């Protein structure tokens, strides 16, 4: 048997951890306390649309109904080549977690002033996963402090780079 030829690096698409959508505003608007990886119940046309890289987590959030966690306002556009069996773009989608994880999340949400926010949507081993965060909303002054801290860190890194190059 002939051995397979090695291809160019990066020539094949890495389907193991392909990020479809990320919610960058969530890290700005919320203080992330804990993250969970959850499966998501999807229809076939939704998966095909996600493989095309089409999704928006901008207004998405998760809620608890009857001991189940649902993802609401996730926008997955209709599959372009779909027929009359296409899905509704903003339908509610069930998140798949272990019962003990669900009970743990429900307890934490009820105890504190916390919410569930999706951070990213990605493929792992051919399955769609959602990175879900247990988060607390930030006030305006908290957001300003984070921006100031990030600017200060950026300045320190810039100055260290200058000193390393001998430009002092």
Swiss-Prot record:
UniProtKB keywords: Cytoplasm, RNA-binding
Identify the HAMAP family for this entry: SmpB (MF_00023)
A GO cellular component annotated for this chain's UniProt record is: cytosol
Function description: Required for rescue of stalled ribosomes mediated by trans-translation. Binds to transfer-messenger RNA (tmRNA), required for stable association of tmRNA with ribosomes. tmRNA and SmpB together mimic tRNA shape, replacing the anticodon stem-loop with SmpB. tmRNA is encoded by the ssrA gene; the 2 termini fold to resemble tRNA(Ala) and it encodes a 'tag peptide', a short internal open reading frame. During trans-translation Ala-aminoacylated tmRNA acts like a tRNA, entering the A-site of stalled ribosomes, displacing the stalled mRNA.
Fetch the SUPFAM superfamilies from UniProt: Small protein B (SmpB)
Protein localization: Cytoplasm
**Family membership noted in the UniProt record:** Belongs to the SmpB family.
Top-level taxon in the UniProt lineage: Bacteria
Q: Name one GO biological process term.
A: trans-translation
Q: Which protein, by its recorded name, is this?
A: SsrA-binding protein
Q: Which organism is it from?
A: Mycobacterium sp. (strain KMS)
One Pfam family this chain carries? SmpB
Instruction: Report a single Gene Ontology molecular function.
Output: RNA binding
Any signal peptide, and if so, which residues? Answer: none
Establish whether keyword Cytoplasm is in the entry.
yes
Q: Does the keyword Zinc belong to this entry? A: no
